[in-house]
Curated annotation (Swiss-Prot):
The enzyme's E.C. designation: 1.17.99.9
The protein's annotated pathway: Porphyrin-containing compound metabolism; heme A biosynthesis; heme A from heme O: step 1/1
Function (record text): Catalyzes the conversion of heme O to heme A by two successive hydroxylations of the methyl group at C8. The first hydroxylation forms heme I, the second hydroxylation results in an unstable dihydroxymethyl group, which spontaneously dehydrates, resulting in the formyl group of heme A.
Protein name per UniProt: Heme A synthase
Positions bound to heme: H258, H319
Subunit organization: Interacts with CtaB.
Gene name linked to the record: ctaA
One GO CC term on file: plasma membrane
Paired cysteines (S-S): none
Segment forming the signal sequence: none
Organism per entry: Flavobacterium psychrophilum (strain ATCC 49511 / DSM 21280 / CIP 103535 / JIP02/86)
Length: 339
């Protein structure tokens, strides 16, 4: 680990910045700020408008797009309101630029100093490609809300969100490979359960994106049952014609799936912990499992509260941030059962 300390710090710094970016992205979504910047320029958008005249010009450009014409024009939407939503989208993109610099500049330095072995270099090249693709996905998502509908595609939003989580998890995995270079005997049953758990968490993140994109957290604000005391609410059937659409495009169906997967995630983590009692575990493995139990309980509780209180900004942001911590802990635990 000592020989790779600077590389490890670099990778973990990247993880932290991705975490911050996704939290800010959550605020951007929950404050309806994501469509405030109607174009994308790598250099000229680095700073927000610096004069009142430039603000007026940018605001007038925003007025040409569906979100203003179909929604905000009816809400006495002022330049001051616009500056608020512009800030969050600008800040989200600004952090993305910082992440790019934080990755590329040290990467070049490590290349020159030959601090990256062939395997780590290959993994970092993959990370570079993932970062570039994530930037494309961000604009691809925003573009969907600038044409006809004054909202982004929930499919594109979920793709953008989920890929950020995956990029974070892979960056953490690369760092863990350097922190724990030694090999040990793999406990196959526990590793396989941990893999399934990680996959289900990724699926839950996808549906979390669907819920956010469709504003599906604003309906059926009851727990443990949906509205009218129903486990499977009739609106799931009525909203869409096909079963696929009901569970990918219908608000009630998407929320039902998100609710249901939460039970599977919690159950798998409890099952993994129970199965681990039959094996001799390392300290890192025990710590990972104990942390998972605590975090999944907190996240489950946050999810219920977010639903019951109709997604207040602060709860929605904390719920998304805790999903990151749950993913990080699952990734760490899987790594400790895999290497």
């Amino acid at each position: 680990m000592k020989n790779n300390k600077s590389v490890i710090i670099w990778l973990l710094s990247g993880c932290f910045l991705v975490f911050i970016m996704v939290v800010v992205g959550g605020i951007t979504r929950l404050t309806n700020s994501g469509l405030s910047m109607t174009d994308w320029h790598l250099v000229t958008d680095t700073f927000p408008p610096l004069t009142e005249a430039k603000w007026e010009e940018t605001f007038e450009k925003y007025k040409l797009f569906p979100e203003y014409q179909k929604i905000n024009i009816h809400n006495d939407f002022t330049l001051s309101d616009y500056k608020f939503i512009y800030f969050w989208e600008w800040f989200h993109r600004f952090i993305g630029r910082i992440i790019g610099l934080v990755f590329i500049i040290p990467f070049i330095y490590f290349l020159i100093k030959k601090k990256l072995n062939t395997e780590t270099l290959r993994k970092c090249a993959i990370l570079l490609g993932m970062g570039a693709f994530q930037g494309f996905l961000g604009w691809f998502m925003v573009k969907s809300g600038l044409i006809d509908a004054p909202d982004v595609s929930h499919f594109r939003l979920s793709l953008h969100l989920t890929f950020a989580f995956i990029t974070f998890a892979y960056t953490l995995w690369v760092a863990l490979d350097l922190i724990y270079p030694e090999k040990k005997q793999v406990i196959l049953p526990l590793r396989n359960i941990a893999r399934i758990t990680l996959a289900i968490i990724i699926l839950q993140i996808i549906y979390g994106g669907f819920v956010a994109g469709l504003n599906a957290g604003l309906i059926h604000n009851h727990w443990p049952l949906m509205s009218d005391g129903q486990f499977f609410h009739e609106s799931i059937i009525l909203e869409k014609e096909s079963w696929f659409a009901r569970f990918t495009e219908g608000k009630s169906g998407v929320q039902f799936v998100h609710r249901t997967i939460a039970y599977f995630v919690a159950g798998l983590i409890v099952f993994l912990t129970f199965k681990s009692k039959k094996h001799t575990l390392s300290l890192e493995q025990k710590n990972g499992l104990n942390a998972l139990l605590i975090i999944v309980f907190i996240q489950f509780t946050l999810g219920v509260l977010t639903l019951l209180y109709s997604v207040p900004l602060w709860l929605g942001v904390i719920h998304q941030a805790m999903a990151f911590i749950l993913l990080a802990t699952t990734t760490y635990t899987l790594h400790r059962f895999s290497k």
